Amino acid sequence: MKRVLIIDVLNMYLRSYIVVPSLSTNGQPIGGLVGTIKSLQKLARETKPDHIVFAWDGPNGSMKRKIMDKNYKEGRKPIRLNRAFHNLSEDEETQNKVWQQSRLMEYLNIMPVIQTILPEIEADDVISYITQMPYYKGWQKIIVSNDKDFMQLCDEETVLMRPVKKELLNKSRITEQTGVHPTNMALARAIIGDASDNLPGIKGAGFATVAKRLDFLSEEKTYTIDEVIEHCENSNSTLKFFSNVIEGRELVEHNYKMMQLYSPQMSIQAKTITKEAIENFEFTFNKTELIKMMNIDGFSDLNLSDLTAHMNRIAREN
C-alpha cells in the first residue's frame, strides 16, 4: 500500500519554534526552522512515505468560522519562545518567528514535497479534503498533528500520528481510548466543547462522561444530534447530564458546525486548486540549494543525510 504523509505544518512549526533552542552562527533563534526540518527527517525515516503534503493555514484562514462565531479562537496567548533571549525585543521575536516560517516554506519548495495554502481556509479543512480525494484512494493516509480534531477523520485507510504523545492512532485505538468511534467524534466533541478554540461545551460533560452516558457513540454507525437528544429525553435517569444536553441543544448544534471536518469548509474552486496542485505536482529535489541555504542560515553542521536520501527516493520514484 502506498503511503502519504499529510502534515499539519503550522502545528509542527510552532511546537518547534517554542521548544527547540537552536541558534544560528550569528546567535539568532532558528529553532522553528531546524526543529521542523529535523522532524521531517524523522518522519521520512520512520514512515518511508511515497508522497508528503504540508498543509498551511491560509491568510485569514479562520474567517469562515469567525463569521459563524466571533469568539472563535479568541483569548489565545501569543506564541512566545519558552526561553529568554535578552537580545530580542518582543517585536524582534515576532519578526523572527515570521521570518523562520517564511524561510521554512522556501526550504520545502526545493524538496519533492507538496505545500498547500489557500486564502480564508484552515489547514484542517484542506487535510480533510486530501484524505477524501479519489487520487489517494487505496493509499494509507497518515495525518501528522497533535490536534485531537483529526481523530474524526480516521478510518480504514487514515490514521493520526501525534508526535508529542508519541502515538499512532487508528480508528480502533481511538474508540478504545475515548469510548467514541471516529464517525461520532465531532458529535461527542460538540457536547464536550474545545477550550483551545474558545468553544464552551455542556456543563459537566467530559470524554469519560459522554462515553459512559452515550455509550452508543462507540458504534461505527453515525449518530445525529436528534438521536442524542431523543436518547436523553427517553432516559429515566435523574442525572443532570441528560437535561443539560437537552437544554444545550443549540450549543451542541453550533459546536458541531464549527468542529466537524467530515464536510470540509472549502469552495469547489478551492478543492479544484488543491486537487490540481497535488495531481500535477513535479517531484524535484535540489540538494545543492539545500546545502547553500543551510550555510547561509547558519546550521550547515546539521546532519540531514537521511532526509536527503528519502527526498532523492521520492523524487526518483515519482
Question: Where in the sequence are the language-model features?
Answer:
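Noncatalytic, basic helical substrate-engagement surface that gates or grips nucleic-acid strands
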Residues: 2-142, 150-168, 260, 265-280
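Non-catalytic nucleic-acid-binding/docking modules located in mid-to-C-terminal regions
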Residues: 46-56, 71, 75-77, 112-113, ...
